[in-house]
């Protein structure tokens, strides 16, 4: 029971210190960061110990305190330690510690350094409380605290109007889901008379078996519970807050997208799966929402210029895979992908933070510039360690063996064939799209030359390679001199106009370690690699990405069972009355793996063809000419590509639809209500008063 409360003293003491002793608290601010890491490390040790116990003993542990209000109603508070809890606790603590260490350097120059660590520790407390909850009321309390923390962290730089609007959007969108969750909790309490998970599942199964419930009402309550998970895990149609959540600091994006907020929705569905699985229509709904989100997230990631927003839509798509697996009843596959994706995505977000951190010294502290992939390029020469680790995370998400996400995604893809061929085709096609958009991000960021020196910030292009489109370099221009190689024509790849580097910029000279509390005096003409305190967490997450997939590989041939994940999840799988298939047909596995990896490599090839800089592959000019012939077919193809690009870049116009019809309609209703209240209701009251005064 103490696990959620171990990190809690940090936000309390920081808040009290800033109120009572602000100067002293700020002067010892590094001490608070150390305490945050220390306390979360203690929780991690507890979590690992509990996980080892779970693997060895395959048991549940639950303790409940009853608060009796009267003879008919009581509130129970306690903790539930089962495989799902231990997995989530291990994820939250390991990723959280890496993010806190990384943040010490990343936020070193920020005025809100202490506030940031207070919010982060409170976020960890809220999420740990959520995953250890033993009943729905406790879940709902910590669910709201997680939403509050995300609101505070997304709007951390609240003086920026964009960040203020983003945190409000996330908060309001999640309130829709939270209201549904509350109604669903009350509905199931009315049906079963209990909030406790074990009692709830047992009573509900008996009611279903004896046909003593109204299936329409039960289905409605289950849908309302699921709506809460849809909003929190950014599933269609309540996904609109996720890309805007990138307005917060990058370490927050890593934590939200890897192990906390978006994982909470997956956790809730996994926790309530014994309830959902006896209501077939809900399982169909979960799988349908999952497959729609898989495809929508992947297509919306195709044309994003902001590196963090591209990764955000990637998260949305991968969460769709997890939701699809849960809807198919593949409990093990969903949690396996939750684990592998968490480390890979944390690695990618911290890597993007390292890139942004290095770009800020050139383009300034404007997210529109420092996160714009159109201003990047050629960073492999300047940030080699970040490049290697980012490539590792990219390959993992693409599903390339032997990296982590290959094993988990392959399980989901194989299970989808058994569930529905249509869903399987969409899921496999999206695996190719995943490889395409992830390598698009990688190539635009690390390959070619640094584009920032060939731009002006007035919005005019000084080079044909600035604009990003689905085709890469603003499409391939039919009249471009790159497409003809006549003897009398010269070939050039950049504008002939020279753009001198600012006179204040000078060659990069800096020590490998920097003192965090002093401003950098130099302005660099090129990006530079991050400091050790930022590279260490990235390196550790890279190791996780390499090796964490091995816990779910069923190496259990010849009577030797080394499938750690199946041992870990055995109690939960038994509760779901599922047969755990610990054996693997390696011939079948290799056949499916070859197909999935081939699709991934095809996506990588297409991305390389479209986004690899033309000037680095002159030998491909004839191939490019083949695809860029004039004619009606080419014009039609351009229109199709531009339509897809506009649809993707404008977020499938879903945000515009919500803004125009939902937000506009609600604001119109609010204005009418305000007018009616002030002019009609108050007018009647004031009129009676005036008449009384005259009489």
From Swiss-Prot:
Protein name listed in UniProt: NAD(P)H-quinone oxidoreductase subunit 5, chloroplastic
Organism (species): Capsicum baccatum (Peruvian pepper)
Subcellular location: Plastid, Chloroplast thylakoid membrane
Membrane-spanning residues: 1-21, 32-52, 81-101, 117-137, 139-159, 177-197, 211-231, 250-270, 278-298, 319-339, 346-366, 388-408, 417-437, 535-555, 594-614
GO BP terms: ATP synthesis coupled electron transport; electron transport coupled proton transport
Primary enzyme class: translocase
Pfam families assigned to the protein according to its UniProt record, in alphabetical order: Proton_antipo_C, Proton_antipo_M, Proton_antipo_N
Membrane topology category: Multi-pass membrane protein
């Amino acid at each position: 029971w103490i696990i959620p409360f171990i990190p809690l003293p940090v936000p309390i003491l920081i808040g009290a210190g800033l109120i009572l002793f602000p100067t002293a608290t700020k002067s010892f601010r590094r001490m608070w960061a150390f305490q945050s890491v220390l306390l979360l490390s203690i929780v991690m040790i507890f979590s690992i110990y509990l996980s080892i116990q779970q693997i060895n003993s395959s048991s549940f542990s639950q303790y409940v305190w009853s608060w009796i209000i009267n003879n008919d109603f009581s509130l129970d508070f306690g903790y539930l330690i089962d495989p799902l809890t231990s997995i989530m606790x291990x994820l939250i603590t390991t990723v959280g510690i890496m993010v806190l260490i990384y943040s010490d350097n990343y936020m070193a120059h920020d005025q809100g350094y202490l506030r940031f660590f207070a919010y982060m520790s409170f976020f960890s407390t809220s999420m740990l409380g959520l995953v250890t909850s033993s009943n729905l009321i406790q879940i709902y309390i910590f669910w709201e605290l997680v939403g509050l923390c995300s609101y505070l962290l997304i709007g951390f730089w609240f003086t920026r109007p964009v960040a203020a609007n983003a945190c409000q959007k996330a908060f309001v969108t999640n309130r829709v889901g939270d209201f549904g969750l509350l109604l669903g909790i009350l509905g199931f309490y009315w049906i079963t008379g209990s909030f406790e998970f074990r009692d709830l599942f047992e009573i509900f199964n008996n009611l279903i078996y004896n046909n003593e419930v109204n299936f329409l009402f039960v289905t409605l309550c289950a849908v309302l519970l699921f709506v809460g998970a849809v909003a929190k895990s950014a599933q269609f149609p309540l996904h609109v807050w996720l890309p805007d959540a990138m307005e917060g600091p990058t370490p927050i994006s890593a934590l939200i997208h890897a192990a906390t907020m978006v994982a909470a929705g997956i956790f809730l569905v996994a926790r309530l799966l014994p309830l959902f699985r006896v209501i077939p229509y809900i399982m169909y709904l979960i799988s349908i929402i999952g497959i729609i989100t898989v495809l929508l997230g992947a297509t919306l990631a195709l044309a994003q210029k902001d590196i963090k927003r591209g990764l955000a839509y990637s998260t949305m798509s991968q969460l769709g895979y997890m939701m699809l697996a849960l809807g198919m009843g593949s409990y093990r596959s969903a949690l396996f992908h939750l684990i592998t994706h968490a480390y890979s995505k944390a690695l990618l977000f911290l890597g993007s933070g390292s890139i942004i951190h290095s770009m800020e010294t050139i383009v300034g502290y404007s997210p529109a510039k420092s996160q714009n992939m159109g201003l990047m390029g050629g960073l492999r020469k300047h940030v080699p360690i970040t490049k290697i680790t980012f490539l590792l995370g990219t390959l993992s998400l693409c599903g390339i063996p032997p990296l982590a996400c290959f094993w988990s995604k392959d399980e989901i893809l194989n299970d989808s064939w058994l569930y529905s061929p249509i869903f399987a085709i969409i899921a496999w096609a999206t695996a190719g799209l995943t490889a395409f958009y992830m390598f698009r991000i990688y190539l635009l960021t690390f390959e070619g030359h640094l584009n920032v020196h060939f731009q002006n910030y007035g919005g005019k292009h000084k080079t044909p390679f600035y604009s990003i489109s689905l085709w890469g370099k603003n499409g391939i221009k039919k009249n471009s001199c790159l497409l003809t190689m006549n003897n009398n024509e010269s070939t050039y790849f950049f504008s002939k106009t020279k753009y001198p580097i600012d006179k204040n910029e000078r060659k990069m000279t800096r020590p490998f370690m920097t003192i965090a509390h002093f401003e950098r005096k130099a302005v660099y003409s090129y990006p530079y690699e991050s400091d050790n305190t930022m590279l260490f967490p990235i390196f550790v997450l890279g190791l996780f990405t390499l090796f964490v997939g091995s816990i779910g590989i069923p190496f259990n041939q010849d009577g030797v069972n080394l499938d750690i994940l199946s041992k870990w999840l055995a109690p939960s799988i038994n509760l779901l009355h599922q047969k755990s298939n610990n054996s693997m047909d390696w011939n079948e596995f290799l056949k499916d793996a070859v197909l999935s990896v081939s699709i991934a490599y095809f996506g990588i090839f297409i991305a390389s063809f479209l986004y690899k800089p033309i000037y680095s592959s002159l030998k491909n000019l004839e191939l490019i000419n083949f695809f860029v012939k004039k004619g009606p077919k080419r014009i039609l193809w351009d229109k199709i590509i531009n339509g897809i690009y506009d649809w993707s870049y404008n977020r499938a116009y879903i945000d515009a639809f919500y803004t125009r019809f939902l937000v506009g309609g609600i604001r119109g209703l609010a204005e009418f209500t305000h007018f009616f209240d002030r002019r009609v209701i108050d007018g009647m009251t004031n009129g009676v008063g005036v008449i009384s005064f005259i009489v």
